[in-house]
Amino acid sequence: MMQFLIAAPRSGSGKTTVTCAVLTALQRRGTDPCAFKCGPDYIDPMFHRSALGVESHNLDLYLSAPDTVRTLYARYAAGHGAAVCEGAMGFYDGQGLTTRASAWELADTLALPVLLVVQPKGASITLAAELRGLLQFRTPSHIVGILLNDCSEALYKTLRPMLEAETGLPVVGYLPHLPGCVIESRHLGLKTAGEISDLQQKLGKLADALVLNWTQLAVLTDRPAPAAAPPLAAPCTPSVRIAVARDEAFCFAYAETLDALRDAGAELAFFSPLRDAALPENIGGLYLPGGYPELYARQLSENIALRAAIRDAGQEGLPTAAECGGFLYLGQTLEGTDSKVYPMTGVLPGSGHNTGRLVRFGYAAMTAKADSMLFHAGETLPVHEFHHWDSSENGADFSVCKAKKRQWECGFASAHLYAGFPHLYWAGTALPRRFVQAAQHFLKHKG
């Protein structure tokens, strides 16, 4: 089975572009690949999903223990002909100035061969020096081959023999520069896949242009299929419906989190806060993931019926979990990207506003101060934050600590609520079971 991780010396090298080109090409070849993303990024898996038509999954060694990551990888790679994982940032870049949770650590944990994406612009033999450093920085590096990105055929033919002689690594192919296939970005990274109307055409052109020695790559990356691992939790029969917001405004939900909720006994009922006038019927819980509500603040405010329904549900004690953008939606008002302020659901105090910069960015550890729907007092969970918007009322039911000992308070928690900026990774934790139990209890005692 072909299994490999696509990494690069630094961010901005074209990992997502190359990964999507490779996935599309593998799909065309009838290989039936599956896709993974190293780290907590929500957007890159959307592009993988567009290339394959199936879910891509996150693997994060800060948010999850190594055994959990191995179990998730085995679960989602099962039955596929190839597994392709996209790295994050530079190959060795992890939490702070360490390799923790880096692409290299993920490759090391899963014993994955690494295909290194290199952009040759502005350098020649210096590339070989850089590659030697990457090969020697940690042992084993797991790097088995090189792919040149934004590279012409002529330059590929010139550089390939030199790089192979200097590094001992095969240069397995190249992807030429395609100006018409550039994927635009915004304040949280790339635009989402759903916002690019001609994405399928772009992916097709990338796959057409990709030059790759597939036979050589298959030999370099052939590994035994991952052994079946015991499930993180024994799957339960669906026992309660949980409403999950899913549309352009709320699109940051991990596929693994949704599967963990299903495994815990939830039937997921998806709805759109942009378009639906009511919550799904017969629900015992509500999950509002993150996303880009600030881009759609006007449209969200205009859906008066749903805003009222969510406010009423909150007052009735409907078990609710809201992360980042979902948390902003529960507030009183939200400043849109047009700088206008719009009413939101009003379940919580506070007004969301644009700070113009990243706020509390990165990994952190969040500790509960008291028992609540999802947490026990003193319980600590790894989380991450990534947002430019903030709230005038962030809550104080949790204490949060970053690696450099920076601390702050955040979040609202009660017997029926979790709401705050931190994104949670539910798989492999007690959160899904606790949320489902709260939903069951709500329905049992409703009315």
Where are these regions (language model features)?
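Internal gly/pro-rich beta-alpha loop/helix module
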Residues: S124-A234
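Cysteine-nucleophile active-site neighborhood
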Residues: P293-D371
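Phosphate-binding active sites in nucleotide-utilizing proteins
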Residues: P238-Q315
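Beta-strand->loop->alpha-helix junctions that form or flank phosphate-binding loops
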Residues: K37-C38, V171-P179, E267-R275
